[in-house]
Amino acid sequence: MPHITLSEDGLIRIIQRIVKSRGRVRLGIGDDAALLHDGTVITTDAYAAGAHFDLSYMTLHQVGERCACGAISDIVAMAAEPEAVLVSLALPHRALCPAPRVRRRAKVLSIEQQVRQLYSGIDNICAEMGCEVAGGDIIVTDHLLLALTVTGKTRTPKFRSGARPGDTLYVTGYLGSAEAGRIVLAEEARSRKPGARGRDGERRSSRGDWRLPLVSRHLRPVPRLRVMGELKPLIHGLIDTSDGLATDARHLTEMSGVKIVLEADALPILPATTRFCTCRGSDPLSFVLGAGEDYELLFTSSRPIPSSMKGVNVTRIGSVQHGRGLWIHRADETMPVTASGYDHLKNISNNGKTC
C-alpha cells in the first residue's frame, strides 16, 4: 500500500466530517479555540518531550512556562481573556535529568521535583496573564507529556474568518525569533563543549551575546494579552503565529475567502534573526515565512494601527484583496507563497509509519 502523507489540516477536515453539531457550540473545530454561546472560549494543546520541547536545553520550569504561553495564546487569538487552566500531566516512570547545559552536572529529578518545577512554570505565566490553574490529571507513563486546557471569556470574539477585502494586514512583535532561538539552543546542546565554536565561527555559548534575544523568544514567548484591549475594537480577522507566518496567513485567506498579499520588505525581523540566517547562508524571508511558535498576533483591520501599543511593535505587513490565496510582493514582483510552516503530521504516513 503506498504511503500517503496526511497534513494536520487534512486530518482536521476528516474530523469535521465525522463529528456533528448539536447546537451547544457557537463555533467548533477550525479556529484557534472553540466558542460557546455565552462567550466562553475553550482551547486545548498537547505537548510531548522531543516534539514540542527539548529537555537537553530546557528546565522543567521553562517547559511549564512555554507550554502555558502556547495554550493561553490561543485564547488571546480569539480576543478573549484567559480564566482557568487545566493541566493533564503524564510523567515518565524513570527520573528525569533535564537541561544538563544549564549546570555542570545533570541533576536527577524525582517525580515530586518534576511536578514542582512544571507547575511553578505554568503558574508563573498564569500570574502574569491573570488566570489560574483550576485542576487537571496526573498519570505515570513512558514519556513526559502535557496537555493544557484553557478557558476564557469574551463578549466580542474575533475569528480567522473576519478578514475583508480592503483591510490591511498587521503583526505584533517580530517574526522568526523563536525558531532561530530553538536552533541555537539545539546546536549548543549537541556540541556539549563549553566555548565550542558553531557554524558562524563565534563562541557557542548563547548567554550574553547577540543570540540572547533569540533564545529568550524561544524559551519564554509572550502571549499578547496586554495589547488586545486596545486592538480588539479595530480587528476584523485574527490568528496567532503558532505555525508560522505562511501557514497562519493562509488560514486567514482560506477561512475568510480572500487574497492576502504580503510585503516582503515590511516583515519585522530582529537584527539577530537576520544575522542568524546570514551565518547559515539562508534567506531571512524564506526562514521567517516557515518559522513558527512566535505566538504573535496576525490580524487585519480597516483602521490605521499605531506602530507601537503598550510597548509592543505593530507592523503593517500586507493587504487583503478580492481573490484567493497567499501572495508576496518582493522586488517589483508578486508571486504565490509556497512555503509552509509547522505541521504536526508532516512525517506521518496514512498507515502510521514514519515516511
Question: Model-found features: residue ranges?
Answer:
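Glycine-rich anion-binding loops of enzyme active sites
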Residues: 37, 82-97, 103-188, 319
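Residue-level signal for inorganic ion chemistry
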Residues: 35, 71, 79, 133, ...
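General beta-strand structural signal in soluble alpha/beta enzymes
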Residues: 27-28, 41-44, 132-136, 150, ...
